[in-house]
UniProtKB/Swiss-Prot annotation:
It is found in: Mitochondrion inner membrane. This is Mitochondrial import inner membrane translocase subunit Tim13. It comes from the Eukaryota. Disulfide bonds join 35-58, 39-54. It comes from Drosophila melanogaster (Fruit fly). Its main location: mitochondrion. Gene3D superfamilies: Mitochondrial import inner membrane translocase subunit tim13 like domains. Belongs to the small Tim family. GO terms for biological process: protein insertion into mitochondrial inner membrane. It holds the Pfam family zf-Tim10_DDP. Mitochondrial intermembrane chaperone that participates in the import and insertion of some multi-pass transmembrane proteins into the mitochondrial inner membrane. Also required for the transfer of beta-barrel precursors from the TOM complex to the sorting and assembly machinery (SAM complex) of the outer membrane. Acts as a chaperone-like protein that protects the hydrophobic precursors from aggregation and guide them through the mitochondrial intermembrane space. SUPFAM superfamilies: Tim10-like.
Amino acid sequence: MAAANMEKGELMNQVKQQIALANAQEMLSKMTEKCFKKCIQKPGKSLDSTEQRCISQCMDRFMDAWNLVSRTYGNRLQREQYRTMESLEMTS
């Protein structure tokens, strides 16, 4: 029974890692698409300094927004989990 629980835990960790990787890949893809559309008017062999600066600032803002949303969502999940646990304790 303990071995089965350990395998289940390991499987859950692998699934969480795969989800995190998929989320990171999706974020990178969206960031690339949005910043490219915003900053690159005429694609060529290289980026000029204005395009480089725009890409850098766009990526920084995108990451800041992503981190803010992630923290806020994580905090909300924790609050809801805490409320659920309190509710369960009250009914016991």
